[in-house]
Amino acid sequence: MRVSHAAAGLAVVLALTGCQRTSFGGFGSQDVSRAPAPLQAQPVPSVSAGQLPPPAGASQFPAAPTTGTAAPGAAAGTEVAAATNALDVTKESMVGNWRVSSAGSSCDMFLTLTNLGSGSRGGTRGCAGELTAMGSWEVAGKQVVLKDRSGNPIARLYKTADARFDGSTNGGQPVSLSR
């Protein structure tokens, strides 16, 4: 019993010794209570204000094209034909699951009637490119507009058959929805 009491006492003493702070020089010999010296103020140069001169010479940017190209999201030649031949579409007929084909790959799209901003909630699964950002949609006339999560249009589609919509993304990629 005495040996176990002595061993326990020795263990307590060793444990308490490990909790004490000791200084052996080197890192511990510095006075840690002393604050660092304050920084000295430096002179600040004066600030001047004035009007900038107008740009000289030709503009560094090329002139915008006036014909031959459509603005992003605007109807291109084939889309104009699709718009005039498009079938009528209602929001209710769009609700549900759609199979999307775009840029040679397929994915799923889900459309609901839950309001989200200026459109209705929607989303994609397994899509690539611009369609990954799809967050809402709306029907505008005979056109179905897919929008990103900020409400910006990313694709426009037209009803071409009973359960089929065709169109393109703003980047020009063809998109088809079918059931």
From Swiss-Prot:
GO terms for cellular component: cell outer membrane. Belongs to the rhizobiaceae omp19 lipoprotein family. Its main location: membrane. Residues 32-72 are annotated as: Disordered. This is Outer membrane lipoprotein omp19 homolog. Residues 1-18 form the signal peptide. Pfam families: Inh. The keyword Hydrolase does not apply. It comes from Rhizobium meliloti (strain 1021) (Ensifer meliloti). It is a lipid-anchor. One of its GO terms (molecular function) is endopeptidase inhibitor activity. Residues 62-72 have a biased composition (Low complexity). Gene3D superfamilies: 2.40.128.10. A lipid is attached at residue 19 (S-diacylglycerol cysteine). The gene is omp19. It is found in: Cell outer membrane. Keywords: Cell outer membrane, Lipoprotein, Membrane, Palmitate, Signal.
